[in-house]
């Protein structure tokens, strides 16, 4: 029975004191982790003598909406071990400087009687010494220095640069402000007060989804994770939610228990795939091909064979499908051109911002109308007309936009479309009408909807090089065509497209795509986004609870934006902030442009101004244009 004596004997239980002392705490502090994470989880930080001893998830989140599950539990493995980062022996908690630079600077400073600015100037004037510390880059050799030493060298180099080149040659970069608003603002304010330049960040490391400003004119406007529960069809595309959205993954699982179909598109069976009803292992970078085939099926079965009223109304009201595009002939080939402006027709002669207002046709009268949702109405003097109401912005008359000229057209023109995947071109029939411009010319125009039908290979009885069926591999964008790129069978595409569209029809748009930085980091990743968004728009999913395109990366938003930006950019001193787009700055100054050619080297696009200029030429042109 000696083991009983061991249990009750105080002498044999002293080891317990080690654990009691390890987990003792003086107080509990509520906090979160500023690690560029959108989780924003609330943590109970247990502190002893000013040192974090352990962390625990808070359990007091308010349940403000009983239609969705509670937000708890929130947290992740990274969060609960965050104190290990704080007290890690490899965490750098002090300034370090390359020994080669430190020795050279101190020697010059001593020779200059202690003047740091003169010392830096002499160091820069000596090419041999300058090259010595430059060649040391990438080879280690760091030494710990005092804060005063580091700050003195930074200040001296800044003053020298201002005196010799001007303050706008001092460039600063930091990751996204929401990661640490105070840290970012202090550095940015320092730069702005002396005329320096801040580089952009969100776009530089490819977190900003370019498709969003291209389509909607905003940066990243997505739903919060609780809205996943209201969806009835979720596609996780290039987003490993179990790893990158750990505090929110429970909404994904709970939505599935609530009857939501969950699909994961990923080359590998990732952490999130185990939460899904279906795993689609498309080849990396082929998501766009898959979605274009899905849209082909949606247009065929839900816009042509059967016109779903909700889809048709949404397409008219919330997309640019009714807008008119001029068709232009070049070397005997007809190509889609620019959208037609109201300034080009005499009916709207003298309209303010006419170059930024575009045309629809009223389905009832056949008259030209000017929709109010365009940029021209946003910036004109008369306010209150920048909306999506079906009223002519110039006359106020109600109208019903014409989506297609299929039943009422003046002509059918063979228009050339380019398919870059297989480097092919096709001539396809497009119904057109003729509009007489101010100068008396008759210009053929087509709706974006009709051009989209032709682009996606839907003939609707028109002549041209259209696919013969879903199984036609030689014509974009059939289910069989996408097999070449994705490795996914056409039957999977058909099932997916029909389930997506049927769910969107029944729920009026409660189908969503969750996407992460993986696809956004691909060359032309914006086109993969847009391929998916196309299917969403044509089934009325964007702007709906439980629907739309939801791109999650870091913490791109901060609450006190207006007041914070005043401090950050030193607007309180009356200065105009100097800001520079990060990608272009690095593209030019790192000589990356030297490795690119003209756009026409990479695709079979027709010769035009865009294709015949280098990206660097366009960057220079943008600067010249202000």
Please describe what each predicted stretch is.
Residues 466, 473-474, 480, 492, ...:
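A glycine-rich, hydrophobic/aromatic-adjacent loop/helix-cap motif
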């Amino acid at each position: 029975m000696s083991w009983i004596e061991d249990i009750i004997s105080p002498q044999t239980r002293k080891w317990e004191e080690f654990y009691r002392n390890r987990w003792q705490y003086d107080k509990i502090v509520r906090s979160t982790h500023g690690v560029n994470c959108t989780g924003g989880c609330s943590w109970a930080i247990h502190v002893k003598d000013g040192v974090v001893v352990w962390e625990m998830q808070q359990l007091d989140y308010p349940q403000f909406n009983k239609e969705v599950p509670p937000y708890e539990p929130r947290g992740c493995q990274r969060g609960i071990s965050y104190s290990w980062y704080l007290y890690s022996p490899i965490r750098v908690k002090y300034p370090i400087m390359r020994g080669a630079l430190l020795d050279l600077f101190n020697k010059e400073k001593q020779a200059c009687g202690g003047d740091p600015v003169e010392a830096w100037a002499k160091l820069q004037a000596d090419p041999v010494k300058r090259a010595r510390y430059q060649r040391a880059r990438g080879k280690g050799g760091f030494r710990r220095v005092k804060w005063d030493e580091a700050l003195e060298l930074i200040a001296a180099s800044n003053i020298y640069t201002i005196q010799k080149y001007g303050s706008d040659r001092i460039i600063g970069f930091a990751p996204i402000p929401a990661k640490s608003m105070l840290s970012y603002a202090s550095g940015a304010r320092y730069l702005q007060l002396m005329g320096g330049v801040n580089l952009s960040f969100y776009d530089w490391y490819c977190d900003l989804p370019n498709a969003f400003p291209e389509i909607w004119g905003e940066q990243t406007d997505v739903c919060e994770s609780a809205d996943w529960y209201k969806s009835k069809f979720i596609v996780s595309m290039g987003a490993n939610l179990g790893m990158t959205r750990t505090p929110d993954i429970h909404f994904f699982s709970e939505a599935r228990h609530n009857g939501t179909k969950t699909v994961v598109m990923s080359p590998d069976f990732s952490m999130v795939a185990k939460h899904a009803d279906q795993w689609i292992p498309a080849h990396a970078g082929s998501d766009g091909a898959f979605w274009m085939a899905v849209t082909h099926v949606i247009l065929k079965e839900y816009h042509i064979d059967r016109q779903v009223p909700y889809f048709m109304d949404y397409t008219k009201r919330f997309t640019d499908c009714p807008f008119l595009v001029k068709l232009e002939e070049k070397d005997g080939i007809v190509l889609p051109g620019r959208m037609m402006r109201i300034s080009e027709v005499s009916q709207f002669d003298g309209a303010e911002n006419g170059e930024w207002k575009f045309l629809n046709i009223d389905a009832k009268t056949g008259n030209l109308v000017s929709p109010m949702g365009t940029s021209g109405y946003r910036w004109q003097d008369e306010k209150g007309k920048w909306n999506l109401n079906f009223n002519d912005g110039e006359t106020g008359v109600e109208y019903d936009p014409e989506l297609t000229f299929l039943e009422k057209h003046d002509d059918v023109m063979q228009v050339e479309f380019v398919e870059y995947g297989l480097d092919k071109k096709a001539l396809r029939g497009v119904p057109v009408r003729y509009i007489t411009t101010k100068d008396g010319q008759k210009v053929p125009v087509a709706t974006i909807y009709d051009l989209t039908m032709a682009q996606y290979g839907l003939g609707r009885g028109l002549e041209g090089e259209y696919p013969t069926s879903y199984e036609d591999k030689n014509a974009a964008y059939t289910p069989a065509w996408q097999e070449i790129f994705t490795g996914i069978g056409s039957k999977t595409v058909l099932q997916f497209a029909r389930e997506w569209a049927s769910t969107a029809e029944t729920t009026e748009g409660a189908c969503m795509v969750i996407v992460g930085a993986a696809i956004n980091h691909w060359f032309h990743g914006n086109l993969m986004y847009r391929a998916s968004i196309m299917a969403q728009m044509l089934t009325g999913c964007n702007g709906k609870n439980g629907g739309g395109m939801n791109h999650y990366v870091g913490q791109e938003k901060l609450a006190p934006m207006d007041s914070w930006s005043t401090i950050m950019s030193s607007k309180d001193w009356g200065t105009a902030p100097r800001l520079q787009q990060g990608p272009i700055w690095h593209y030019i100054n790192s000589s990356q442009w030297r490795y690119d050619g003209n756009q026409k080297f990479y695709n079979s696009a027709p010769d035009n101004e865009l294709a015949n200029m280098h990206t660097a030429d366009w960057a220079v042109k943008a600067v010249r244009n202000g």
